[in-house]
Amino acid sequence: MSGGKGKAGSSEKASTSRSAKAGLTFPVGRVHRLLRKGNYAQRVGSGAPVYLTSVLEYLAAEILELAGNAARDNKKSRIIPRHLQLAIRNDEELNKLLGHVTIAQGGVLPNIHQNLLPKKSAKGKASQEL
């Protein structure tokens, strides 16, 4: 029996975060705290913050991947709000999810109505018919 202070005789292992246990990068503990403090429900289960964190991480990864592709298409190495806007609006499901979201400095999608485009030349059609 050791009477001194310290952890000389104990074999306690280092604590592992819930994010590491779930294989996530986003913080599970912070999401759990925000769920408790936000008055969304009286009690919060132990699996709810893990699930919500994984969903948030997946959405962030999806948007950042598409925005990175948009930045590369524009020959840029840095993602700007314009790239986020293009990524979200060109993806059908993300556009539906974030349809009412305004992105500051995002701009608009390039779109020209069909009636405003120049008409096809009549010479091209006539030569093909003969």
From Swiss-Prot:
N-acetylserine modified-residue sites: 2
Assign the protein's first listed, main location to one coarse class.
Answer: nucleus
GO BP annotations of the record are:
DNA repair
Could you tell me which InterPro entries the record lists for this protein? Answer: Histone-fold (IPR009072), Histone_H2A (IPR002119), Histone_H2A/H2B/H3 (IPR007125), Histone_H2A_C (IPR032454), Histone_H2A_CS (IPR032458)
Any idea which GO molecular function terms this record carries? DNA binding; protein heterodimerization activity; structural constituent of chromatin
How is the polypeptide modified once translated? Phosphorylated to form H2AS128ph (gamma-H2A) in response to DNA double-strand breaks (DSBs) generated by exogenous genotoxic agents and by stalled replication forks. Phosphorylation is dependent on the DNA damage checkpoint kinases MEC1/ATR and TEL1/ATM, spreads on either side of a detected DSB site and may mark the surrounding chromatin for recruitment of proteins required for DNA damage signaling and repair. Gamma-H2A is removed from the DNA prior to the strand invasion-primer extension step of the repair process and subsequently dephosphorylated. Acetylated by ESA1 to form H2AK4ac and H2AK7ac.
Q: Which Gene3D superfamilies match?
A: Histone, subunit A
Name the residues annotated as site: Not ubiquitinated.
Answer: 119
Q: Which GO terms describe its cellular component?
A: nucleosome; nucleus
Chain spans, region Disordered? 1-22
Q: Which residues carry this modification: N5-methylglutamine?
A: 105
Residues modified as N6-acetyllysine: 5, 7
Phosphoserine modification sites? 127
Q: Which cellular compartments is it found in?
A: Nucleus; Chromosome
Q: Which CDD domains match?
A: HFD_H2A
Q: Which UniProt keywords apply?
A: Acetylation, Chromosome, DNA damage, DNA repair, DNA-binding, Methylation, Nucleosome core, Nucleus, Phosphoprotein
The set of disulfide-linked cysteines is none
Q: According to the lineage, what is the superkingdom?
A: Eukaryota
Query: Where can the motif [ST]-Q motif be found?
Result: 127-128
Q: Which family does it belong to?
A: Belongs to the histone H2A family.
Supply any other comment.
Answer: In contrast to vertebrates and insects, its C-terminus is not monoubiquitinated.
Q: What does this protein do?
A: Core component of nucleosome which plays a central role in DNA double strand break (DSB) repair. Nucleosomes wrap and compact DNA into chromatin, limiting DNA accessibility to the cellular machineries which require DNA as a template. Histones thereby play a central role in transcription regulation, DNA repair, DNA replication and chromosomal stability. DNA accessibility is regulated via a complex set of post-translational modifications of histones, also called histone code, and nucleosome remodeling.
How is the quaternary structure described? Answer: The nucleosome is a histone octamer containing two molecules each of H2A, H2B, H3 and H4 assembled in one H3-H4 heterotetramer and two H2A-H2B heterodimers. The octamer wraps approximately 147 bp of DNA.
**Record's comment describing the protein's domains:** The [ST]-Q motif constitutes a recognition sequence for kinases from the PI3/PI4-kinase family.
Protein name as annotated: Histone H2A.1
| Record lineage | Eukaryota, Fungi, Dikarya, Ascomycota, Saccharomycotina
